[in-house]
């Protein structure tokens, strides 16, 4: 069973490397699972452009989903990079991303706890209570009265999303 069989892991990796990069990952899993290979070998095996293979491998490496080892050729002195996927780490990385998202959503929920007002005439942009009070609840653009904006639905959606993410982390 491959780590890519997990829909969440597949989606996470796809988000990182895109469709073309995903093809590189799939070919590596299919053709050279658990083996060290050069980027040139991956390009040759997969039929994918060498620059795209390298870009994908570097992105995976930066996200701790691939590793490499360097070997120096004794005759030429050139360095050869041997790459290997390490997708076992993907679930851990996905959990870290979920924790970051929870923090971001909690900050957004805190912001949404403010009171907002909107202009009836202008394009509906929200104005914080403090600024609305400074302008005597009159739109600074067209001088029409500001109306209270009820963001209860947004706050509830944020709470639901945070709860869902926390439940998924608890599993």
From Swiss-Prot:
Subunit structure of this chain's protein: Monomer. Interaction with RNA polymerase subunits RpoF and RpoE is necessary for Tfe stimulatory transcription activity. Able to interact with Tbp and RNA polymerase in the absence of DNA promoter. Interacts both with the preinitiation and elongation complexes.
The protein's role, per its UniProt record: Transcription factor that plays a role in the activation of archaeal genes transcribed by RNA polymerase. Facilitates transcription initiation by enhancing TATA-box recognition by TATA-box-binding protein (Tbp), and transcription factor B (Tfb) and RNA polymerase recruitment. Not absolutely required for transcription in vitro, but particularly important in cases where Tbp or Tfb function is not optimal. It dynamically alters the nucleic acid-binding properties of RNA polymerases by stabilizing the initiation complex and destabilizing elongation complexes.
Free-text comment about domains: The winged helix domain is involved in binding to DNA in the preinitiation complex.
Organism: Methanocella arvoryzae (strain DSM 22066 / NBRC 105507 / MRE50)
Record GO biological process: regulation of DNA-templated transcription; transcription initiation at RNA polymerase II promoter
Domain HTH TFE/IIEalpha-type positions: 5-91
InterPro entries in UniProt: TF_E_archaea, TFIIE/TFIIEa_HTH, TFIIE_asu, TFIIEa/SarR/Rpc3_HTH_dom, WH-like_DNA-bd_sf, WH_DNA-bd_sf
Any Pfam family: TFIIE_alpha
Highest taxon, organism lineage: Archaea
Gene Ontology MF terms in the entry: DNA binding
Keywords tagged on the record: DNA-binding, Transcription, Transcription regulation
Entries under HAMAP family matching the protein: TFE_arch
Family: Belongs to the TFE family.
Name of the protein in question: Transcription factor E
